[in-house]
Amino acid sequence: MAKPAKRVAVTGAAGQIAYSLLFRIANGDLLGKDQPVILQLLDLPQAQAAVKGVVMELDDCAFPLLAGVVITDDPKVAFKDADVALLVGARPRSKGMERKDLLSANAEIFTVQGAALNEVASRDVKVLVVGNPANTNAYIAMKSAPDLPKKNFTAMLRLDHNRALSQLAAKSGKPVASIEKLAVWGNHSPTMYPDFRFATAEGESLLKLINDDVWNRDTFIPTVGKRGAAIIEARGLSSAASAANAAIDHVRDWVLGTNGKWVTMGIPSDGSYGIPEDIIYGVPVTCENGEYKRVEGLEIDAFSREKMDGTLAELLEERDGVAHLLKN
């Protein structure tokens, strides 16, 4: 008996990340190889022709799991009964644009999208914000959707998590799949803090295997933090395929579970680890039965506290920068 189709909304559907994302969703990489999907694609009126071109390509792949496609410029159509919403589209920073202008331009987009989700999405909708500044955009959407559970709103730190895994595998000489218990704390920005104090590879402590504080402080943390800029420098374009891959990882693990393994998600704080409530902050989680659960009770040393407070300060500044644009 075939499962009923799940509705997956994707914003910024004509963009580069979506182009790497949509074919993988239609192939079953997001929700499982036995789960039919209906794609509900949102983009601006001027991008509708480009979205239609992408849909022609989706048609031409003849994906068995793709049960339907909706193309629209109306968030209320895109988010209707959505089970998953991937908020990829955001206003990019243009030359000479101040950060506060970027925040307010995105606040406008994400208040509208949050309100539309609030009105028409499934009450269990799983929302992942990919568009930057992702944590604060997720916070804005959450605050604009008072009738949906706060826990439904998440921001993507999985790209930072995966970048950190890859650096640790290269440094330790261990297979990337063998590394467990990595955490990335804070904002999806160069201030975030990749933390491998608890990490193991094939059961051995990575901290003991690598045993290099200077590498951690002066190479590892900045390399992960500035990786996006390094890719733009090398390629001339932003990291779209790796971002799409991280979005797939994030939602797949949230829906299908992590089997006890830690992953990083930006989630609304409950006050743990000294993070004020409701701030969307990257923390280690495990996922089971469609729910995430933060890893509790980790010891925070002085260096980690300083790093965690630094990225929190940036998030608080962003929150305060959009406070006047939010109703509640």
Curated annotation (Swiss-Prot):
InterPro entries: L-lactate/malate_DH, Lactate/malate_DH_C, Lactate/malate_DH_N, Lactate_DH/Glyco_Ohase_4_C, Malate_DH_type2, NAD(P)-bd_dom_sf. It catalyses: (S)-malate + NAD(+) = oxaloacetate + NADH + H(+). The active site is at H188 (proton acceptor). It is an enzyme of class 1 (oxidoreductase). One of its GO terms (biological process) is tricarboxylic acid cycle. This is Malate dehydrogenase. Its EC number is 1.1.1.37. It comes from Burkholderia cenocepacia (strain ATCC BAA-245 / DSM 16553 / LMG 16656 / NCTC 13227 / J2315 / CF5610) (Burkholderia cepacia (strain J2315)). Belongs to the LDH/MDH superfamily. MDH type 2 family. GO terms for molecular function: L-malate dehydrogenase (NAD+) activity. The keyword DNA-binding does not apply. Substrate binds at R93, R99, N132, R163. Catalyzes the reversible oxidation of malate to oxaloacetate. Keywords: NAD, Oxidoreductase, Tricarboxylic acid cycle. CDD domains: MDH_chloroplast-like. NAD(+) binds at G12, A13, A14, G15, Q16, I17, A18, N106, Q113, V130, G131, N132. It comes from the Bacteria. Pfam families: Ldh_1_C, Ldh_1_N.
